[in-house]
Each structure stands twice: as C-alpha cells, then as structure tokens.
A protein has these predicted regions:
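Conserved donor sugar-nucleotide recognition element shared by glycan-biosynthetic enzymes
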Residues: 10, 33-37, 81
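N-terminal, positively charged/glycine-rich alpha-helical extensions of SAM-dependent methyltransferases
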Residues: 1-20
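Class I SAM-dependent methyltransferase Rossmann-like catalytic core
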Residues: 18-31
Length: 120
C-alpha cells in the first residue's frame, strides 16, 4: 500500500528540489499556482476550521487558505521532509503546528480536522 519501499527514493528527489521548490511549482503551473490554489480552496475552507495540510512542503496551500479565511484557521502542516517544515513558521502570522511523516501512517485521530488540503 502506498509508496512503501519507494519512499526513500522519493524523499531524496524532494530534498534535491528544496532550493527551487517554489520556482518549480510556478513553472509547472505556467505561473498560475496561486490562482489554482485559490480556486481549489474558495468556499471549501472556512474561518476557524482546523485544517491538515497533507504533504504541505512550505505550506503554500495553507498560506493561501489563511489569505482567504484570515488567521482564525488552526493549521497543521504535515510533510515527510523536516527541512521543508523548518522554515515555514516565518510565513504565518500565527505559526502552524508541525508534524512529519508519510501518508500511510498519519498520526492524527479521526475527526480532528474539519478539512484536509493537499496541493503544490
């Protein structure tokens, strides 16, 4: 189930692109990454929601959600790469909770979150 034994290879590739992560996101979306995030979140995430940003990277989806809903969101960033999570707090007025792991083993109780978001 999931990536299993391939996780180490995937993590190696992701570590390599950390310095250019945001540029890659912009490039592969033809510069429409923020627009696509907004369209995906609009009307789906509401003020005071507890959200899990799964595979959060630098928290781009959560940053967009915060712009749309204000700072009343309770955000948890979840990513397998600790280096991606390390510098995220500086991007948020209210620092999000941070957790590291893979999707196959999400360590949260059922119904802890009002919404789970996942994007690039």
């Amino acid at each position: 189930m999931g990536l299993g034994g391939y996780w180490s290879e995937v993590l190696d590739v992701l570590r390599d692109i950390i310095p250019v992560y945001d540029k890659v996101n912009s490039f592969i979306s033809l510069g429409k990454d923020e627009e696509f995030r907004t369209r995906g979140l609009l009307g789906r995430v509401k003020e005071e929601n507890a959200i899990l940003d799964a595979g959060s990277g630098f928290g781009n989806m959560s940053k967009t959600a915060s712009k749309l809903c204000g700072n009343d969101l309770k955000i948890t960033l979840y990513d397998p790469l600790i280096p991606m999570l390390k510098n995220t707090k500086k991007f948020f007025e209210i620092p999000p909770a941070l957790a590291s792991g893979v999707f196959e083993h999400i360590p949260f109780q059922d119904e802890k979150f009002d919404a789970v978001i996942c994007g690039y």
